[in-house]
């Protein structure tokens, strides 16, 4: 048994024996710590032990040759379970850069399986020892109590994308622990009030916000978003407020537990397409020093491919890298009980070692069928910076969903009044069946969104025609140029009453459209109270008021906040919007598309009015049908609209009419009954009606 193991050797003054080769990383076992790491091309591996926060190791333990099986080194070091220490590795091997092999035994190498990383003392502070990352062994014990995961159906998801720091860092957030996991915990009552049922956190794996630190016009710029990962198994220590236990992940676990207790799932934005090591000029602290030519896609002359736009690309379908990614996701699911993952630039995960797209990528298939990941939500950003665009065609095995970029682009254009878009907009609202039905995936594969961290906020989408990214320091050349936005008559903030009134209506139109569309829905934190980034559509480096949520706007735009709450509650109440698999008893189709004339879908070039009716069996009133009609008039003038006829005994009641501001939400005891099924819709407005029995 493990507890009966005895030392067999003494290395570097420590009692040791060959370790358990199946325990990746550093693991506390009875009597000591088990260290395991892999390298194909190294000829020598040395374990480095440091006293806390020391720059240089106090012990070097070279793995004896007998402690290596295949390409795996493993050693159990006795006594380390009783002392406080940090560790790293050193690898020696050939230096043949033309082949991508670049060993340097002088470099301290971070364990890729490290569960906690030492190197920075807090957010915005440079590394204590530049270029040096060390790891700690963590106590993973945590009492989850009787808490269970919500396990929500995919179609019911209303996802709230947030940045851990930006969500509460501004003083207006009113929380004690600003910019941390604990700060989000303090806002759980707010999330419950809003009604969302999933949070998607932008990257929380350990990253170095100082990695691209620079000054521009007396403004400090950081790697704020966190898409340059340093360590994939460790939470970002800067997001933790509990400095006593900040290397054990307890604060994140407490957040996940309390979100689950409130029926809210947790989705992580993960970045397996590249790392923080960059290109040939980038830092050297992990994969480069272990097996550079294994972990990264390299050209025939040893240079880095750059399909990520960030300097390097992980060689995801190489078996060793594939196993690493699987191990990582399994760890987050089992240790932190994460409910789902959104994969940044996921199309890279389907390329082979020279970048060629694969029909059935082994990694994506493994993730789809892995038993531990079964039931975990897998969401792809189905494109990359190398020009591969796979929305509607991402390899899925009926397990993968996609951020539907077509939904964002088509509906942004349609809602602002562009022509030739009625058919496309109708397809997007009704689950993008033109994209997903041919592969038998259904609308659950379409994660619908109009805003996310990339691009304008919803308020800015109707306040700016052009991006305003000068503060990023690239002379306004960064960020997308084609935003499909419309400033409603003035660029940026204005005192013009009519323009501001129109902007609010457009915001409500957009969100009502999202909530009345089939497929999981996602929106950006702060959209519910008109948060602004002042026209910056690429705030990746802005750790300031540009990217922090301004909570004073919640009171200023209370009507928008209340509208968001109402539409979220409406979507939850009428399940036929999200689940149209059951036909109505009256034999109406589950989904039907209309123009301003009922039962007639016209897609003329100048058509800017769409009506969608959902029909199905009511879950609350047994034996009865329910009907929801959503109409959007993107034209700038009134349009007379005819709603579909209903079965005998039913009539239409109007619930929402953004053309009737400020009373755009109609209280149920004051619902307008459309006896003749007609309404003169105002320009640039939406209506929502419910077919009810009388």
Could you describe each region identified by the protein language model?
Residues 1-160, 165, 186, 191, ...:
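Carbohydrate-interacting/catalytic domains
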Residues 48, 98-103, 171-175, 203, ...:
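Short, solvent-exposed loop/turn and secondary-structure capping segments
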Residues 87, 91-146, 209-229, 281-303, ...:
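Core domains of carbohydrate- and sulfate-ester-processing enzymes
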Residues 114-117, 337, 353-354, 359-525, ...:
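Conserved alpha/beta catalytic core and glycan-binding cleft of carbohydrate-active enzymes
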Residues 158-160, 199, 266-268, 341, ...:
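Hydrophobic faces of well-ordered beta-strands that scaffold small-molecule active sites
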Residues 163-182, 186-338, 345-369, 435:
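Substrate-binding/active-site clefts of carbohydrate-active enzymes
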Residues 171-185, 464-469, 663-675:
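Short, polar loop/linker segments at the starts of domains and inter-domain junctions
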Residues 202-209, 270-279, 345-350, 380-386, ...:
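Short, solvent-exposed turn/loop segments enriched in Gly/Ser/Thr/Pro and often Arg
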